[in-house]
Amino acid sequence: MRHKLNLDLRSVDRIAMLIHSAYGAGKTYLVGDMLKAELERTKGPVLFVNVKGEDGTLSLADMGLGDVGETVETLTDWKELVADAHKRGLKAIGVDSMKALVRLVMRDKIGVDRPPEKTEYGIIHWVMENLATELRTLASVVLCVCPSDKSVNQLDGRTYITPDLPGREAAGSAGWFDFVGYLKADTLSPKEVTRAITFAPNASIITRQRLPKPITHDISIPTGKGGWAAIRGAIEKALQS
């Protein structure tokens, strides 16, 4: 369908974002914080998707989100969830995690008794790209998370910290989203952890941002609620600068 575009428009009405980090940095909590903030801002329906194998929803128990989550265990479950989500007019959707989702794709396409052969990665990448890009059609705000790993970029041969996805998806998944950020967590004491997200271009970490003027500073993520507000605020400020 053809439609006109205003290329001068500066808006964050639609966001598709991937955040990756080491385990235990607070990714799942950030997804819950986003859903709570968007629920309060828009008063519309939101959805948390727990992909079997992650199961970190206990970290969200104090947020008061209620019955807005769903677990998918197979690729068929995922497709049914997407079909239902198209009818619901979701304002925001969070997916935990992309690594678990690619396992569902691999199980569906090649089985579970062996790793993929080299010739099979093509279909896995194609399916994952389609699943990820379709998420944009489900809600105004999409936040996916994924653990990080070190990977060799197949284009330039350099080693990066990337989302922990197979083959060329590790670096290529950045093309599926408007924003790709890396969440850092530094433990100062058993009771004190400082967190920050970077979207700035980095020679050793996969990041991305579709902004006319890039965010070049780390975004501090407060303990508890307020992380999504900090991210959204930084994006809005960059758009208006």
Located regions from the model:
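C-terminal regions of RecA-like/P-loop NTPase motor modules
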Residues: 1-2, 11-12, 190-241
